[in-house]
Amino acid sequence: MSASPLLGMSRREFLTKLTGAGAAAFLMDWAAPVIEKAYGAGPCPGHLTDIEHIVLLMQENRSFDHYFGTLSSTNGFNAASPAFQQMGWNPMTQALDPAGVTIPFRLDTTRGPFLDGECVNDPEHQWVGMHLAWNGGANDNWLPAQATTRAGPYVPLTMGYYTRQDIPIHYLLADTFTICDGYHCSLLTGTLPNRLYWLSANIDPAGTDGGPQLVEPGFLPLQQFSWRIMPENLEDAGVSWKVYQNKGLGRFINTPISNNGLVQAFRQAADPRSNLARYGIAPTYPGDFAADVRANRLPKVSWLVPNILQSEHPALPVALGAVSMVTALRILLSNPAVWEKTALIVSYDENGGFFDHVTPPTAPPGTPGEFVTVPNIDAVPGSGGIRGPLGLGFRVPCIVISPYSRGPLMVSDTFDHTSQLKLIRARFGVPVPNMTAWRDGVVGDMTSAFNFATPPNSTRPNLSHPLLGALPKLPQCIPNVVLGTTDGALPSIPYRVPYPQVMPTQETTPVRGTPSGLCS
Protein backbone atom coordinates (compact mmCIF):
# COMPACT_ATOMS: atom_id res chain seq x y z
CA MET A 1 0.00 0.00 0.00
CA SER A 2 1.42 3.42 -0.92
CA ALA A 3 1.86 6.08 1.74
CA SER A 4 -0.95 8.58 2.17
CA PRO A 5 -0.28 11.97 0.53
CA LEU A 6 -1.37 13.53 3.83
CA LEU A 7 1.45 11.85 5.78
CA GLY A 8 3.66 14.42 7.47
CA MET A 9 1.65 17.36 6.05
CA SER A 10 -0.07 19.91 8.26
CA ARG A 11 -3.65 21.01 7.64
CA ARG A 12 -2.30 24.42 6.60
CA GLU A 13 0.09 22.86 4.08
CA PHE A 14 -2.64 20.65 2.63
CA LEU A 15 -5.04 23.52 2.09
CA THR A 16 -2.30 25.65 0.56
CA LYS A 17 -1.43 22.92 -1.92
CA LEU A 18 -5.09 22.38 -2.74
CA THR A 19 -5.81 26.05 -3.42
CA GLY A 20 -2.53 26.40 -5.26
CA ALA A 21 -3.75 23.75 -7.66
CA GLY A 22 -6.62 26.06 -8.60
CA ALA A 23 -9.39 24.07 -6.95
CA ALA A 24 -12.78 25.71 -7.08
CA ALA A 25 -14.57 26.99 -4.00
CA PHE A 26 -17.18 24.23 -4.17
CA LEU A 27 -14.37 21.63 -4.05
CA MET A 28 -13.03 23.23 -0.88
CA ASP A 29 -16.49 23.08 0.69
CA TRP A 30 -16.86 19.44 -0.30
CA ALA A 31 -13.35 18.44 0.81
CA ALA A 32 -13.32 20.23 4.17
CA PRO A 33 -15.09 17.46 6.15
CA VAL A 34 -12.80 14.86 4.59
CA ILE A 35 -9.71 16.88 5.48
CA GLU A 36 -10.89 17.40 9.05
CA LYS A 37 -11.59 13.69 9.42
CA ALA A 38 -8.13 12.85 8.06
CA TYR A 39 -6.62 14.92 10.83
CA GLY A 40 -8.89 13.52 13.52
CA ALA A 41 -10.25 17.01 14.11
CA GLY A 42 -13.36 16.04 16.08
CA PRO A 43 -13.33 18.06 19.28
CA CYS A 44 -9.57 18.66 19.09
CA PRO A 45 -8.42 22.17 18.21
CA GLY A 46 -4.81 20.99 17.87
CA HIS A 47 -2.95 18.08 16.37
CA LEU A 48 0.58 16.77 16.28
CA THR A 49 0.81 17.72 12.61
CA ASP A 50 0.29 21.37 13.58
CA ILE A 51 3.76 21.30 15.13
CA GLU A 52 6.04 21.88 12.17
CA HIS A 53 9.29 22.61 14.03
CA ILE A 54 10.83 20.64 16.90
CA VAL A 55 13.66 22.56 18.60
CA LEU A 56 15.83 20.73 21.15
CA LEU A 57 17.88 22.67 23.72
CA MET A 58 19.99 20.75 26.21
CA GLN A 59 21.57 22.27 29.31
CA GLU A 60 24.06 20.81 31.79
CA ASN A 61 24.29 18.79 34.97
CA ARG A 62 21.18 19.31 37.13
CA SER A 63 18.75 16.83 38.68
CA PHE A 64 14.99 17.25 39.03
CA ASP A 65 14.98 17.40 42.84
CA HIS A 66 17.97 19.78 42.73
CA TYR A 67 15.97 22.31 40.66
CA PHE A 68 12.29 21.49 41.11
CA GLY A 69 11.97 19.48 44.32
CA THR A 70 9.92 22.33 45.83
CA LEU A 71 7.72 22.92 42.76
CA SER A 72 3.99 22.43 43.35
CA SER A 73 2.08 19.31 42.26
CA THR A 74 5.17 17.38 41.11
CA ASN A 75 6.87 14.25 42.45
CA GLY A 76 9.16 16.26 44.69
CA PHE A 77 10.06 16.73 48.33
CA ASN A 78 6.57 15.91 49.64
CA ALA A 79 6.88 12.34 48.36
CA ALA A 80 7.11 9.59 50.95
CA SER A 81 10.57 8.22 50.20
CA PRO A 82 13.33 6.86 52.46
CA ALA A 83 15.84 8.06 49.87
CA PHE A 84 15.68 11.60 51.28
CA GLN A 85 17.73 10.43 54.27
CA GLN A 86 21.19 9.65 52.93
CA MET A 87 23.92 8.32 55.21
CA GLY A 88 27.59 9.26 55.15
CA TRP A 89 27.88 12.88 56.34
CA ASN A 90 27.19 14.43 59.73
CA PRO A 91 25.86 17.99 59.40
CA MET A 92 26.39 18.65 63.11
CA THR A 93 30.13 17.90 62.99
CA GLN A 94 30.50 18.82 59.30
CA ALA A 95 32.47 15.64 58.74
CA LEU A 96 32.32 12.27 57.04
CA ASP A 97 30.45 9.83 59.25
CA PRO A 98 29.03 6.47 58.11
CA ALA A 99 26.19 6.86 60.63
CA GLY A 100 25.51 10.52 59.86
CA VAL A 101 22.33 11.43 57.98
CA THR A 102 21.98 14.31 55.54
CA ILE A 103 18.68 15.39 53.99
CA PRO A 104 18.22 17.83 51.09
CA PHE A 105 19.28 21.38 51.97
CA ARG A 106 18.91 24.68 50.19
CA LEU A 107 21.79 26.18 48.25
CA ASP A 108 20.96 29.78 49.12
CA THR A 109 21.90 32.15 46.29
CA THR A 110 21.32 35.29 48.38
CA ARG A 111 24.25 34.99 50.80
CA GLY A 112 26.85 36.90 48.79
CA PRO A 113 30.39 36.14 47.62
CA PHE A 114 32.12 33.05 49.06
CA LEU A 115 28.91 31.88 50.74
CA ASP A 116 26.74 31.83 47.66
CA GLY A 117 24.90 28.67 46.66
CA GLU A 118 24.89 30.06 43.12
CA CYS A 119 28.46 28.89 42.66
CA VAL A 120 28.70 25.36 44.07
CA ASN A 121 30.96 22.91 42.33
CA ASP A 122 30.48 19.73 40.43
CA PRO A 123 29.61 16.65 42.46
CA GLU A 124 30.97 13.34 41.15
CA HIS A 125 28.77 12.23 38.26
CA GLN A 126 30.61 9.78 36.00
CA TRP A 127 29.84 6.11 35.25
CA VAL A 128 31.27 4.61 38.44
CA GLY A 129 29.96 7.30 40.79
CA MET A 130 26.40 7.19 39.51
CA HIS A 131 26.29 3.40 39.60
CA LEU A 132 27.54 3.55 43.19
CA ALA A 133 24.82 6.06 44.11
CA TRP A 134 22.17 3.94 42.37
CA ASN A 135 23.48 0.92 44.33
CA GLY A 136 21.63 -1.81 42.49
CA GLY A 137 18.37 0.14 42.67
CA ALA A 138 18.47 0.90 46.40
CA ASN A 139 19.27 4.55 45.61
CA ASP A 140 20.83 4.92 49.06
CA ASN A 141 24.55 5.46 48.47
CA TRP A 142 24.85 9.05 47.27
CA LEU A 143 27.22 10.34 49.95
CA PRO A 144 29.66 7.39 49.93
CA ALA A 145 29.69 7.61 46.12
CA GLN A 146 30.77 11.24 46.38
CA ALA A 147 33.45 10.39 48.94
CA THR A 148 35.23 8.18 46.40
CA THR A 149 36.48 11.25 44.49
CA ARG A 150 35.59 14.35 46.52
CA ALA A 151 37.23 15.68 49.67
CA GLY A 152 35.14 15.89 52.86
CA PRO A 153 33.49 19.35 52.62
CA TYR A 154 32.43 18.74 49.01
CA VAL A 155 30.74 15.39 49.64
CA PRO A 156 27.33 16.67 50.84
CA LEU A 157 26.85 19.08 47.90
CA THR A 158 25.04 16.26 46.14
CA MET A 159 22.06 16.92 48.46
CA GLY A 160 21.75 20.63 47.64
CA TYR A 161 18.69 22.12 45.96
CA TYR A 162 17.31 25.47 44.75
CA THR A 163 13.97 27.20 45.25
CA ARG A 164 11.88 29.65 43.25
CA GLN A 165 13.76 32.51 44.91
CA ASP A 166 17.03 31.14 43.55
CA ILE A 167 15.96 30.27 39.98
CA PRO A 168 12.82 32.36 39.33
CA ILE A 169 12.91 32.15 35.53
CA HIS A 170 13.10 28.36 35.60
CA TYR A 171 10.05 28.26 37.87
CA LEU A 172 8.19 30.79 35.75
CA LEU A 173 8.78 28.69 32.64
CA ALA A 174 7.55 25.62 34.53
CA ASP A 175 4.41 27.56 35.51
CA THR A 176 3.83 28.84 31.98
CA PHE A 177 4.27 25.59 30.06
CA THR A 178 4.48 21.81 30.71
CA ILE A 179 6.94 20.43 33.26
CA CYS A 180 7.90 16.75 32.97
CA ASP A 181 8.54 15.16 36.38
CA GLY A 182 9.24 11.70 34.96
CA TYR A 183 12.01 12.71 32.56
CA HIS A 184 15.33 10.90 33.09
CA CYS A 185 18.74 11.28 31.56
CA SER A 186 19.43 8.27 29.37
CA LEU A 187 22.48 6.86 31.14
CA LEU A 188 23.93 6.50 34.63
CA THR A 189 26.92 8.68 33.75
CA GLY A 190 28.04 12.11 32.55
CA THR A 191 27.75 14.59 29.71
CA LEU A 192 29.16 13.15 26.49
CA PRO A 193 27.51 9.71 26.67
CA ASN A 194 24.13 11.29 27.42
CA ARG A 195 24.51 13.81 24.61
CA LEU A 196 25.41 11.00 22.23
CA TYR A 197 22.11 9.38 23.23
CA TRP A 198 20.34 12.70 22.57
CA LEU A 199 21.76 12.70 19.04
CA SER A 200 21.75 8.99 18.24
CA ALA A 201 20.30 6.73 21.00
CA ASN A 202 23.63 4.91 21.17
CA ILE A 203 27.05 4.80 22.84
CA ASP A 204 28.13 1.58 21.06
CA PRO A 205 28.15 -0.81 24.06
CA ALA A 206 29.43 -3.63 21.84
CA GLY A 207 32.50 -1.60 20.85
CA THR A 208 32.17 -2.08 17.10
CA ASP A 209 31.98 1.56 16.00
CA GLY A 210 34.39 3.52 18.19
CA GLY A 211 32.75 3.00 21.58
CA PRO A 212 31.78 2.23 24.22
CA GLN A 213 31.77 5.85 25.41
CA LEU A 214 31.04 5.65 29.13
CA VAL A 215 32.54 8.86 30.53
CA GLU A 216 33.26 12.46 29.66
CA PRO A 217 36.71 12.85 28.06
CA GLY A 218 38.85 15.94 28.57
CA PHE A 219 38.45 16.81 24.90
CA LEU A 220 35.61 16.00 22.56
CA PRO A 221 36.85 13.25 20.23
CA LEU A 222 37.30 14.05 16.54
CA GLN A 223 35.87 11.55 14.04
CA GLN A 224 36.10 8.71 16.54
CA PHE A 225 32.65 7.18 16.15
CA SER A 226 30.98 5.66 13.11
CA TRP A 227 27.52 4.51 14.17
CA ARG A 228 24.46 6.02 12.53
CA ILE A 229 23.06 9.21 14.05
CA MET A 230 19.58 10.73 13.94
CA PRO A 231 20.54 13.48 11.44
CA GLU A 232 21.36 10.74 8.92
CA ASN A 233 17.91 9.23 9.42
CA LEU A 234 16.34 12.66 8.89
CA GLU A 235 18.49 13.24 5.81
CA ASP A 236 17.40 9.96 4.25
CA ALA A 237 13.76 10.75 4.98
CA GLY A 238 13.98 14.21 3.42
CA VAL A 239 13.24 15.95 6.73
CA SER A 240 15.22 19.17 7.16
CA TRP A 241 17.49 19.52 10.20
CA LYS A 242 20.39 21.52 11.64
CA VAL A 243 22.61 21.52 14.70
CA TYR A 244 23.20 25.14 15.76
CA GLN A 245 26.12 25.62 18.14
CA ASN A 246 28.12 28.40 19.68
CA LYS A 247 31.61 28.58 18.20
CA GLY A 248 33.41 30.18 21.13
CA LEU A 249 36.22 28.80 23.30
CA GLY A 250 37.21 25.85 21.11
CA ARG A 251 37.50 22.13 21.81
CA PHE A 252 37.89 22.19 25.56
CA ILE A 253 36.51 20.03 28.38
CA ASN A 254 32.74 19.81 27.86
CA THR A 255 30.59 19.28 24.82
CA PRO A 256 28.81 22.67 25.09
CA ILE A 257 32.05 24.51 24.40
CA SER A 258 33.27 22.39 21.55
CA ASN A 259 33.57 24.67 18.55
CA ASN A 260 32.07 22.04 16.26
CA GLY A 261 29.78 20.09 18.55
CA LEU A 262 28.79 16.46 18.61
CA VAL A 263 28.52 15.76 14.89
CA GLN A 264 32.25 16.35 14.43
CA ALA A 265 32.87 13.28 16.61
CA PHE A 266 31.60 11.06 13.78
CA ARG A 267 33.75 9.88 10.90
CA GLN A 268 30.95 10.20 8.37
CA ALA A 269 30.98 14.00 8.91
CA ALA A 270 34.68 14.35 8.04
CA ASP A 271 33.99 15.64 4.52
CA PRO A 272 33.21 19.38 4.88
CA ARG A 273 31.12 19.18 1.69
CA SER A 274 28.78 16.56 3.16
CA ASN A 275 25.35 17.49 4.43
CA LEU A 276 26.36 16.18 7.86
CA ALA A 277 29.09 18.81 7.99
CA ARG A 278 27.04 21.57 6.30
CA TYR A 279 24.07 21.19 8.62
CA GLY A 280 25.63 19.52 11.66
CA ILE A 281 28.88 21.45 12.10
CA ALA A 282 28.70 24.78 10.24
CA PRO A 283 25.53 26.46 11.65
CA THR A 284 26.12 28.91 14.49
CA TYR A 285 24.12 29.68 17.61
CA PRO A 286 22.48 32.04 18.18
CA GLY A 287 23.36 33.86 14.92
CA ASP A 288 22.27 31.40 12.24
CA PHE A 289 19.38 30.15 14.35
CA ALA A 290 17.98 33.67 14.71
CA ALA A 291 18.49 34.37 11.01
CA ASP A 292 16.68 31.19 9.99
CA VAL A 293 13.75 31.98 12.29
CA ARG A 294 13.46 35.50 10.89
CA ALA A 295 13.61 34.26 7.30
CA ASN A 296 11.02 31.48 7.81
CA ARG A 297 13.58 28.81 6.96
CA LEU A 298 13.85 27.06 10.32
CA PRO A 299 14.27 23.33 9.64
CA LYS A 300 11.83 20.72 10.88
CA VAL A 301 14.28 19.55 13.57
CA SER A 302 16.93 21.68 15.32
CA TRP A 303 19.47 20.94 18.04
CA LEU A 304 20.73 24.00 19.97
CA VAL A 305 24.10 24.15 21.79
CA PRO A 306 24.69 27.48 23.62
CA ASN A 307 28.05 28.63 24.94
CA ILE A 308 29.55 27.29 28.15
CA LEU A 309 28.72 30.39 30.22
CA GLN A 310 25.00 29.77 29.67
CA SER A 311 25.11 25.98 30.02
CA GLU A 312 24.40 25.86 33.81
CA HIS A 313 27.40 23.58 34.33
CA PRO A 314 28.60 23.96 37.94
CA ALA A 315 30.13 26.20 39.17
CA LEU A 316 28.69 28.60 36.61
CA PRO A 317 25.80 30.73 37.90
CA VAL A 318 22.47 28.99 37.52
CA ALA A 319 21.00 32.40 36.69
CA LEU A 320 22.93 32.43 33.41
CA GLY A 321 21.13 29.26 32.39
CA ALA A 322 17.94 31.27 32.37
CA VAL A 323 19.60 33.56 29.82
CA SER A 324 20.08 30.59 27.51
CA MET A 325 16.47 29.45 27.71
CA VAL A 326 14.95 32.90 27.38
CA THR A 327 17.24 33.75 24.45
CA ALA A 328 16.07 30.69 22.51
CA LEU A 329 12.43 31.43 23.33
CA ARG A 330 12.73 35.10 22.39
CA ILE A 331 14.24 34.20 19.04
CA LEU A 332 11.26 31.95 18.32
CA LEU A 333 8.81 34.60 19.51
CA SER A 334 10.40 37.15 17.17
CA ASN A 335 8.54 35.49 14.30
CA PRO A 336 4.96 34.66 15.34
CA ALA A 337 4.45 32.59 12.19
CA VAL A 338 7.25 30.27 13.33
CA TRP A 339 6.43 30.32 17.04
CA GLU A 340 2.81 29.28 16.54
CA LYS A 341 3.88 25.94 15.03
CA THR A 342 6.97 25.16 17.15
CA ALA A 343 7.78 23.00 20.16
CA LEU A 344 10.93 23.91 22.12
CA ILE A 345 12.05 21.15 24.48
CA VAL A 346 14.49 22.21 27.20
CA SER A 347 16.21 19.31 28.94
CA TYR A 348 19.42 18.58 30.86
CA ASP A 349 22.03 16.09 29.71
CA GLU A 350 22.55 14.45 33.11
CA ASN A 351 21.95 15.01 36.80
CA GLY A 352 25.50 16.25 37.41
CA GLY A 353 25.86 14.12 40.53
CA PHE A 354 23.01 15.98 42.26
CA PHE A 355 20.64 13.79 44.27
CA ASP A 356 17.22 12.67 43.07
CA HIS A 357 14.91 10.50 45.15
CA VAL A 358 13.33 8.57 42.25
CA THR A 359 15.01 5.26 41.42
CA PRO A 360 15.25 5.08 37.62
CA PRO A 361 13.89 2.13 35.64
CA THR A 362 16.79 -0.07 34.53
CA ALA A 363 17.05 -3.02 32.19
CA PRO A 364 17.39 -6.57 33.53
CA PRO A 365 20.83 -8.18 33.17
CA GLY A 366 21.46 -9.43 29.67
CA THR A 367 19.03 -7.05 27.97
CA PRO A 368 20.36 -6.54 24.41
CA GLY A 369 21.96 -3.14 23.92
CA GLU A 370 21.57 -2.10 27.56
CA PHE A 371 24.85 -3.50 28.91
CA VAL A 372 28.47 -3.18 27.79
CA THR A 373 29.43 -6.39 26.00
CA VAL A 374 33.05 -5.80 24.92
CA PRO A 375 35.24 -8.76 25.98
CA ASN A 376 37.55 -6.76 28.26
CA ILE A 377 35.48 -4.34 30.30
CA ASP A 378 38.54 -3.18 32.24
CA ALA A 379 40.01 -1.77 29.02
CA VAL A 380 37.08 0.62 28.58
CA PRO A 381 38.03 4.08 29.93
CA GLY A 382 36.15 4.95 33.10
CA SER A 383 34.25 1.67 33.34
CA GLY A 384 35.54 0.63 36.75
CA GLY A 385 34.71 -2.91 35.68
CA ILE A 386 30.98 -2.08 35.61
CA ARG A 387 29.07 -3.37 32.56
CA GLY A 388 25.79 -1.71 33.35
CA PRO A 389 22.96 -1.24 33.24
CA LEU A 390 23.37 1.70 30.88
CA GLY A 391 20.21 3.36 32.16
CA LEU A 392 17.85 4.92 32.57
CA GLY A 393 19.73 7.55 34.52
CA PHE A 394 18.37 9.78 37.27
CA ARG A 395 15.66 12.37 36.69
CA VAL A 396 16.58 15.70 35.15
CA PRO A 397 14.46 18.80 34.48
CA CYS A 398 12.54 19.02 31.23
CA ILE A 399 10.12 21.74 30.12
CA VAL A 400 8.06 21.54 26.91
CA ILE A 401 7.56 25.06 25.57
CA SER A 402 4.96 25.55 22.85
CA PRO A 403 1.61 27.22 22.13
CA TYR A 404 0.29 23.66 22.50
CA SER A 405 1.71 23.18 26.01
CA ARG A 406 0.68 26.32 27.86
CA GLY A 407 0.43 25.66 31.56
CA PRO A 408 0.66 25.31 34.37
CA LEU A 409 0.72 21.68 33.24
CA MET A 410 2.60 18.59 34.38
CA VAL A 411 3.13 15.18 32.82
CA SER A 412 4.52 12.26 34.83
CA ASP A 413 5.07 9.75 32.03
CA THR A 414 8.51 8.16 31.88
CA PHE A 415 10.76 9.89 29.34
CA ASP A 416 14.46 10.07 28.56
CA HIS A 417 16.57 11.69 25.83
CA THR A 418 15.45 9.08 23.32
CA SER A 419 11.88 10.26 23.92
CA GLN A 420 12.80 13.40 22.01
CA LEU A 421 13.85 11.20 19.10
CA LYS A 422 10.60 9.24 19.47
CA LEU A 423 8.69 12.53 19.21
CA ILE A 424 10.48 13.20 15.93
CA ARG A 425 9.50 9.68 14.85
CA ALA A 426 5.87 10.26 15.83
CA ARG A 427 5.66 13.60 14.04
CA PHE A 428 7.69 12.99 10.89
CA GLY A 429 7.73 9.20 10.56
CA VAL A 430 11.52 8.97 10.79
CA PRO A 431 12.79 5.76 12.44
CA VAL A 432 15.14 5.58 15.43
CA PRO A 433 16.88 2.28 14.63
CA ASN A 434 19.52 2.53 17.37
CA MET A 435 16.95 2.49 20.17
CA THR A 436 16.80 -0.80 22.04
CA ALA A 437 13.53 -2.68 22.18
CA TRP A 438 13.59 -2.50 25.98
CA ARG A 439 13.98 1.27 26.05
CA ASP A 440 11.42 1.79 23.32
CA GLY A 441 8.92 -0.05 25.49
CA VAL A 442 9.78 1.85 28.69
CA VAL A 443 9.88 5.50 27.64
CA GLY A 444 7.16 7.54 25.98
CA ASP A 445 7.29 9.72 22.88
CA MET A 446 6.44 13.00 24.64
CA THR A 447 3.17 13.51 22.75
CA SER A 448 1.48 13.32 26.16
CA ALA A 449 3.21 16.59 27.12
CA PHE A 450 1.03 18.57 24.70
CA ASN A 451 -2.48 19.82 25.38
CA PHE A 452 -4.08 19.36 21.98
CA ALA A 453 -7.59 19.32 23.49
CA THR A 454 -7.28 23.05 24.20
CA PRO A 455 -6.86 25.75 21.54
CA PRO A 456 -3.21 26.74 21.15
CA ASN A 457 -2.11 29.86 22.98
CA SER A 458 0.58 31.63 20.96
CA THR A 459 0.50 34.89 22.94
CA ARG A 460 3.84 36.13 24.16
CA PRO A 461 4.70 34.81 27.66
CA ASN A 462 5.48 37.50 30.21
CA LEU A 463 9.21 36.85 30.58
CA SER A 464 11.73 39.58 31.30
CA HIS A 465 15.21 38.89 29.99
CA PRO A 466 17.37 37.69 32.92
CA LEU A 467 20.75 38.80 31.55
CA LEU A 468 21.09 42.01 33.57
CA GLY A 469 20.23 40.18 36.78
CA ALA A 470 22.55 37.29 36.02
CA LEU A 471 25.72 39.14 35.04
CA PRO A 472 26.54 40.47 38.55
CA LYS A 473 26.57 36.88 39.81
CA LEU A 474 29.39 35.83 37.50
CA PRO A 475 32.33 37.55 39.27
CA GLN A 476 31.50 36.00 42.66
CA CYS A 477 31.54 32.57 41.01
CA ILE A 478 34.94 33.00 39.35
CA PRO A 479 36.96 31.14 42.02
CA ASN A 480 34.77 28.08 41.80
CA VAL A 481 34.38 28.36 38.02
CA VAL A 482 38.16 28.21 37.69
CA LEU A 483 38.59 25.42 40.22
CA GLY A 484 35.29 23.61 39.98
CA THR A 485 35.32 22.70 36.29
CA THR A 486 38.31 20.46 36.93
CA ASP A 487 36.20 17.59 38.29
CA GLY A 488 37.51 18.11 41.79
CA ALA A 489 41.20 18.11 40.86
CA LEU A 490 41.70 21.46 42.59
CA PRO A 491 40.27 22.66 45.91
CA SER A 492 37.39 25.10 45.64
CA ILE A 493 35.15 26.89 48.11
CA PRO A 494 32.74 24.43 49.79
CA TYR A 495 29.19 25.17 50.92
CA ARG A 496 28.46 24.50 54.57
CA VAL A 497 25.51 22.19 55.21
CA PRO A 498 22.93 23.94 57.44
CA TYR A 499 22.31 22.50 60.89
CA PRO A 500 19.85 21.69 62.39
CA GLN A 501 18.27 20.09 59.36
CA VAL A 502 14.68 20.65 58.24
CA MET A 503 13.10 18.60 55.48
CA PRO A 504 11.97 20.92 52.66
CA THR A 505 8.38 21.00 51.46
CA GLN A 506 6.76 21.86 48.16
CA GLU A 507 4.83 24.93 47.11
CA THR A 508 1.06 24.55 47.19
CA THR A 509 0.32 26.70 44.13
CA PRO A 510 -0.16 26.77 41.27
CA VAL A 511 -2.14 23.58 40.90
CA ARG A 512 -0.99 21.91 37.68
CA GLY A 513 -3.30 20.28 35.19
CA THR A 514 -2.58 17.27 33.03
CA PRO A 515 -2.16 17.84 29.30
CA SER A 516 -4.46 15.89 26.99
CA GLY A 517 -1.80 14.51 24.68
CA LEU A 518 -3.08 13.28 21.34
CA CYS A 519 -6.86 13.38 21.08
CA SER A 520 -9.54 12.79 18.51
From Swiss-Prot:
Keyword vocabulary terms for this entry: Cell wall, Hydrolase, Secreted, Signal, Virulence
Subcellular location per the Swiss-Prot or TrEMBL entry: Secreted, Cell wall
E.C. numbers: 3.1.4.3
pH dependence (UniProt free text): Optimum pH is 7.5.
Organism superkingdom: Bacteria
PTM field: Predicted to be exported by the Tat system. The position of the signal peptide cleavage has not been experimentally proven.
Enzyme class: hydrolase
Signal peptide boundaries: 1-38
Name of this protein: Phospholipase C A
Organism of provenance: Mycobacterium tuberculosis (strain ATCC 25618 / H37Rv)
